[in-house]
Amino acid sequence: MVQKYFYRIIFYSLATLLLSNCKVPYNPNLKSSETNALIVEGFIDGAAPVSFKLSRSRKLTAGDTAKAVSELNAKVSIEDDHQNVFPLIELGNGIYKSNNTLTLNATYQYRLHIISSNGEEYLSDLVPFKSSPPIDSIGWEFKNGGVQTLLNTHDPNNSTLYYRWSFSETWQFRTPFESYYVYDAGNNTVIPRTEQVFNCWQTDSSTNIYLASTTNLSSDVINQMPLAFMGQHDPKLSVLYSILVTQYALDVTGYNYWLAMQNNTQNVGSIFDPQPNETSGNIHCLTNPSELVVGYVNAGNSSSKRIFISNSSMPQDWNLPSDCLSIIIPDNPDSLKFYFGSVYDPILLITLTSGATVYSAALAPCVDCTLKGTNIKPSFWP
């Protein structure tokens, strides 16, 4: 019995060794147009300034660390089926935006028009203007040790049927130490800070695709739609957290496009999950019809709602103890240059009983919150 078990170990060990040495790099044979495809992200919005982001796809071999290639110096405009044109302004990094909220007619159809810097012309299909109903409420609950945000909405006219959501999260956070001094490298001295770096804010946008359809329900009601989730001890909830949710009404073609994108990007994990498939949007290259363009343009009035969640609503053990430690640094030129000229930041000036002065200090991320966010308070913050 032992011998049989021994031979079984030998067999599986050899099999594992052979399989591990049979890895061959896979280099897909993609067309150049598929490795440099135009990616269009945005929505023709009648309730907020219109914003589109244009970029180019990357080669698979570029890896996750490669930066997205922004599409710069393009001419971008919104057009309707009554010959009205609304030019967008380039803000940089591939962002094109209207100065203000556009006055759009709900009975018209709309499309996006792009002329790239090299003269390629792109046009989306005309789409109907479809307005979103208001968001009824956004709530949250404790779930799986974390916090799950939830959305409720409904359309009394039973005409929306297809929904998509995006959101922006903003959270306030603080460093373990509040610093009142900063190192002046030019003069090798420590001076009082002129701005606080203890209290900061950070903002991030949703990257997943959030969809729902009520076509199989008796009424056009969305109940407890899960959106952002924060795991246990998430620092987003260390002080105050806010989520701004934007809701879009889609037509059935647009919904099917986003559903396919969701299946291709979020639901592929095993042989039992939906497998990747080709997803066609509604944007086309007029000058080169064979060129691949990624994206789908919808139009309508979005609706949005913001809520705040305070750390005071979290369990007492939500905020984990900091692993930041402070040290004492003598107040002399050599020590200041050695410590503060590298990785430490001063915190306080301390006068010892002997009359000598020293500085308490800590690693920069433990002192300066602007390394991770901004110390400018958002206009919507309470």
Regions found by a protein language model. Give the residues of each.
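Bacterial N-terminal signal peptides that target proteins for export
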Residues: 2-10
